């Protein structure tokens, strides 16, 4: 099968030359107890998005072959660039990227799958003002379909990144649009550090999906 060159990992350019260090405040907020944090935050999200009661949330640990990791070669290159940048960050960052590269280059890679049922999903599309955009691309903002929701896509959305030893998540969501048509979005995101590659500066975020405007696959 021919690979789509427009699907893969891409980092936004850092034209302002801002520094995005390893100690991301959102991740650090949950780093002390990531397991209880992800259980609490995802349970809240599932509860808020309940469409048919009762809603279900299932956690499952799986392992995939390294070749099955989405666009793995591109992701390894990003990790190596971040590892080089981490030399100015200190031992904590260097240890993280060394461990991340060992994992991504191992025979298998562990994934914690969180799957819910009887919910509205994370409603898109990936435009400003939608729950999907708030979850994947916004900082310091929240947006949920139900304004009475107990949680938000604010600080809590960082819990999965804190649990991930790669600071990486993949999202697959189904939702109904304004015409009641079923839609599906798939995208990956990493929160790493700002870095340089081929003479260009990049931010600390990396996105997997449609490389045009960092969009999810739909």
Label the predicted regions.
Residues 1-110, 123-130:
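Bergerat-fold GHKL ATPase/HATPase_c domain
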Residues 15, 81, 138-141, 159, ...:
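A generic structural signal for solvent-exposed, polar alpha-helical segments
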Residues 53-74, 133, 169-212:
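Flexible phosphate/Mg2+-sensing switch loops adjacent to catalytic phosphate-binding sites
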Residues 87-180, 189-192:
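Flexible ATP-lid and adjacent glycine-rich G1/G2 motifs of the Bergerat
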Residues 217-218:
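Structured mid-domain segments that build the active-site/substrate or prosthetic-cofactor binding neighborhood
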């Amino acid at each position: 099968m021919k690979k789509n060159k427009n699907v893969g990992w891409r980092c936004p350019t850092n034209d302002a030359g801002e520094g995005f260090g390893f100690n991301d405040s959102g991740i650090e907020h949950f780093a002390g107890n990531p397991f209880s944090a992800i259980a609490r935050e995802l349970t809240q999200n599932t509860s808020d998005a309940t469409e048919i009661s009762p809603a279900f949330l299932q956690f499952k640990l799986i392992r995939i072959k390294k070749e099955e990791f989405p666009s793995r070669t591109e992701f390894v290159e990003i990790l190596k660039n971040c590892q080089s940048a981490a030399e100015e960050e200190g031992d904590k960052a260097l240890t993280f990227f060394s461990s991340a590269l060992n994992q991504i280059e191992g025979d298998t890679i562990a994934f914690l799958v969180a799957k819910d049922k009887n919910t509205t999903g994370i409603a898109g599309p990936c435009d400003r003002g939608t729950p999907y955009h708030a979850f994947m691309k916004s900082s310091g903002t929240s947006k949920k379909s139900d304004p009475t929701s107990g949680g938000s896509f604010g600080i809590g959305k960082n819990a999965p990144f804190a649990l991930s030893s790669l600071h990486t998540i993949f999202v697959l969501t189904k939702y109904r649009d304004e015409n009641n048509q079923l839609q599906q979005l798939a995208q990956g995101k990493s929160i790493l550090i700002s870095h340089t590659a081929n003479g260009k500066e990049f931010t600390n975020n990396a996105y997997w999906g449609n490389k045009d405007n960092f969009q999810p696959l739909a």
